[in-house]
Amino acid sequence: GRGEDAILDRITFRKIRMDHVMTPFCANSFYFCDPDGKTAYVQSREVMPVDERTPAMKRFEFSDIEAKNCHVAASYFEGLPEKKIEEIVMKNVSVSFAENAKSGVPVMSEGVETCSKRGLFARNVTKLVLDHVVIEGQVGEKLELHDIDEKIVED
């Protein structure tokens, strides 16, 4: 939700196996299931002033994870334009898609298009580290990166 007390930091996922999930990795600053989630303020992609209503998404780490037979997207990360997700680290991550993948929206947010077999999407992130990240079977680009300040990709 919105608010300066809404802080996500040091979120770590490690040694996980997933099968037949829609979008295995997501962090979404425009979540619409809170009471104010569908208001113009929450859903606006315009730069807003940073004030007591501004949440913070800081560090996320995903390591040693296999997600197979996925459907919608390999990942969907979207921070606020005025307060980006500070850091996302993905290390030793493998994503593959189901042959007959279902379509859906990758996150609960207005204005996000339905898709299937989409690659890794990230917008409004200060630092993105992709260390031995494998994505197989996607339709279109493996990486859709927008407004990323620092990107480190290692095979």
Task: Outline where the language-model segments fall.
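Extracellular/periplasmic carbohydrate-active domains that bind, remodel
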Residues: 1-155
